[in-house]
UniProtKB/Swiss-Prot annotation:
Residues annotated as transmembrane: none
PANTHER family xref list: ATP SYNTHASE DELTA/EPSILON CHAIN, ATP SYNTHASE EPSILON CHAIN, CHLOROPLASTIC
Localization of this protein: Cell inner membrane
Primary role: Produces ATP from ADP in the presence of a proton gradient across the membrane.
A Pfam family recorded for this sequence: ATP-synt_DE_N
NCBIfam families linked to this entry: ATP_synt_epsi (TIGR01216), PRK01474.1 (NF002403)
Gene behind this protein: atpC
GO-annotated cellular components: plasma membrane; proton-transporting ATP synthase complex
Entry keywords, A to Z: ATP synthesis, Cell inner membrane, Cell membrane, CF(1), Hydrogen ion transport, Ion transport, Membrane, Transport
UniProt keyword annotation of rRNA-binding present: no
Similarity comment: Belongs to the ATPase epsilon chain family.
Source organism (scientific name): Rickettsia felis (strain ATCC VR-1525 / URRWXCal2)
Membrane topology listed for this record: Peripheral membrane protein
SUBUNIT field: F-type ATPases have 2 components, CF(1) - the catalytic core - and CF(0) - the membrane proton channel. CF(1) has five subunits: alpha(3), beta(3), gamma(1), delta(1), epsilon(1). CF(0) has three main subunits: a, b and c.
Record's protein name: ATP synthase epsilon chain
Length: 112
């Protein structure tokens, strides 16, 4: 039984993040959800929000990305998150993250 799962955050321009983790949480269209190793396969629509990656333990996220809407493919051994935009916000404060999230939630026609 695997103790970690490979998490990839993929944008049209690059692989923004790729690392083994104990757990990942993300913003699905129906609400936040988490994925642990050996999760049942699924494909889920994402909305703009925070993806939190738990590298060392499942209680404190070590890496946080702000993503635009997209899609996630989950298997028992990996999670692929495909999104237009992925911003590492691990070291930003809550106000900065909230500002960036509001920008991502705007319709494309209004974004700079």
């Amino acid at each position: 039984m695997n103790e970690t799962i490979l998490v990839k955050i993929i944008t049209p321009l690059s692989i923004a993040f790729e690392k083994q983790a104990k757990m990942v949480t993300m913003p699905g269209e129906e609400g936040m959800f988490g994925v642990l190793p050996n999760h049942a396969p699924m494909i889920v629509s994402l909305k703009a929000g925070l993806v939190q990656v738990y590298i060392d333990d499942i209680y404190n996220p070590q890496i946080t990305y702000l993503v635009s809407s997209g899609v996630t493919e989950v298997t028992g051994s990996y999670v692929n998150i495909a999104t237009e935009t992925a911003i590492n916000v691990t070291n930003l404060n809550e106000a900065e993250i909230a500002t960036k999230l509001l920008e991502l939630q705007k319709p494309l026609s209004e974004q700079h």
